[in-house]
């Protein structure tokens, strides 16, 4: 009888402890994980960037083949120079 009461009490404490430990204080304007509301940032700036990207003027979305090829060649030359030393 005493063991069953102890198990019941431990189960109840486990449930209450699990419920209380999952609580989180959120500051004003913050969501879980430290994320802020998007309205607090300059949404006009974000929408302007999106409009530019939709028009096809995003240079960071286009592959820079010349730069990639140049970087590969420079890395290969640097490795060859290190091997010779």
From Swiss-Prot:
Gene source species: Verasper moseri
A GO molecular-function annotation: gonadotropin-releasing hormone receptor binding
Modified residues (Glycine amide): 33
Name of encoding gene: gnrh2
GO cellular-component term (any): extracellular space
Free-text tissue specificity from the UniProt record: Midbrain tegmentum.
Signal peptide boundaries: 1-23
Residues with PTM Pyrrolidone carboxylic acid: 24
Keywords: Amidation, Cleavage on pair of basic residues, Hormone, Pyrrolidone carboxylic acid, Secreted, Signal
Record family assignment: Belongs to the GnRH family.
InterPro entries named in the record: GnRH, Gonadoliberin
Protein name: Progonadoliberin-2
Domain of life: Eukaryota
Subcellular location: Secreted
